[in-house]
């Protein structure tokens, strides 16, 4: 928006009193213009919040970042550990805002920006994160170890005082309620994959476990599913103060007649050991609680379909996802849970980590490095492509295929 301020012309021969009145009139016009501009900005901000369904409560200086000085200490320690590393990414287990990385000075994933690259948005949606190609944002939540492979996530920051260590993240330090976790299956900005990865259509991906199975196979060449779904006899859907009018063994549920305090609970029984994630599609943007064997892990709210991490489980463990419903609410929801095959994942990680991109120079417009290839393949990088990047291999131009 461009605003033009008019210049006041004062005729010759008028009195000083008339000049003062003219200046006062000009100042009133400017004040009205400023008020109008602020009103337009306010309306635009409210419209943005409504249109994009942001579910972040108001954040003031006193409670940002979550964990305050403890979180600042964790971030400082993280960079001390990585003093010789030219680039890596970090994220929080649960977002406080969509621009936590930019606000706290680390390279993150979540973003809310008017210049969001639609291809990156589609890529994030395909990996199971909260994203939509008509929105200008995407949100990282602690999720799938498979997705983390392709994002260069080396660290996660936990800010609620909880123990978030698992098979795939080790706690390396703690300051008060904030802790730093390192990815035990970390892959850097670039690494060698199988050529078939270039044929995978990320724009058609919808964040499901099946897409991640296809992604894992295309990248590693391991033609076995890395995710095993919990469904059929391993799933029970119950309504508490809500009438379940339709459901199936794969996680679809239709409900109505909700009373105050109603909920729909999905109970999964693990039929094997492993790391569990859940994919949720909640059109009503409900609050939900995640519990294992009756112990509540966390509460969350999402505004778009998203995959989230539950954690390590043992055979026979029960995972409850309790979805809260408003009074008189009626809608549908679809949830699915799956257990990661640790042995297959480890084999795939070994293949992908064999030939890594070792950075020698890094700037916002230049990435240089070396790769000691153990085979022919496709060099994958998690550099967001905006049409301005070009690639050279051994000094010769190379095709960007993905």
Task: Report the location of each language-model feature.
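Conserved luminal/periplasmic juxtamembrane motif of membrane-embedded glycan-processing enzymes
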Residues: 1-240, 286-287, 304-327
């Amino acid at each position: 928006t461009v605003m033009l301020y008019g210049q006041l012309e004062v005729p010759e021969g008028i009195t000083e009193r008339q000049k003062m009145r003219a200046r006062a009139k000009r100042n009133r016009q400017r004040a009205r213009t400023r008020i109008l501009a602020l009103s337009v900005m306010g309306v635009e901000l409210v419209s943005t919040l409504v249109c994009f369904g942001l579910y972040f409560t108001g954040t003031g200086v006193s409670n940002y970042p979550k964990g305050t000085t403890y979180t600042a200490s964790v971030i400082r320690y993280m960079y001390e550990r990585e003093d010789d590393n030219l680039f890596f990414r970090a994220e929080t287990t649960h977002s406080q805002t969509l621009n936590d990385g930019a606000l706290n000075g680390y390279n993150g994933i979540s973003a809310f920006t008017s210049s969001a690259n639609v291809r990156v948005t589609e890529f994030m949606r395909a990996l199971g994160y909260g994203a939509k190609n008509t929105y200008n944002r995407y949100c990282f939540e602690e999720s799938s170890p498979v997705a983390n492979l392709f994002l260069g996530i080396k660290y996660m920051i936990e800010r609620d005082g909880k123990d978030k260590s698992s098979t795939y993240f080790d706690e390396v330090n703690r300051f008060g309620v904030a802790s730093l976790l390192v990815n035990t299956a970390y892959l850097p900005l670039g690494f060698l994959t199988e050529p078939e990865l270039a044929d995978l259509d990320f724009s058609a991906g919808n964040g499901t476990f099946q897409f991640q199975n296809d992604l894992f196979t295309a990248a590693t060449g391991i033609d076995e599913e890395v995710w095993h779904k919990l469904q059929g006899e391993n799933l029970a859907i119950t309504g508490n103060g809500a009438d379940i009018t339709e459901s199936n063994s794969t996680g679809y549920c239709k409900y109505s007649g909700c009373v105050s305090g109603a909920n729909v609970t999905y109970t999964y029984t693990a039929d094997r050991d492993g790391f569990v994630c859940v994919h949720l599609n909640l059109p009503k943007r409900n609050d939900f609680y995640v519990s294992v064997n009756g112990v509540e892990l966390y509460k969350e709210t999402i505004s778009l379909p998203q995959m989230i991490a539950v954690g390590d489980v043992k055979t026979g463990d029960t995972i409850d996802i309790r979805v809260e419903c408003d009074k008189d609410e009626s809608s549908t929801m679809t949830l699915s849970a799956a257990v990661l095959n640790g042995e297959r994942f480890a084999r795939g990680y070994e293949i992908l980590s064999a030939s890594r991109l070792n950075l020698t120079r890094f700037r916002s417009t230049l990435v240089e490095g070396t790769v000691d290839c153990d085979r022919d393949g496709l060099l994958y990088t998690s550099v967001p492509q905006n049409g301005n990047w070009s690639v050279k291999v051994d000094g010769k131009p190379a095709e960007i295929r993905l």
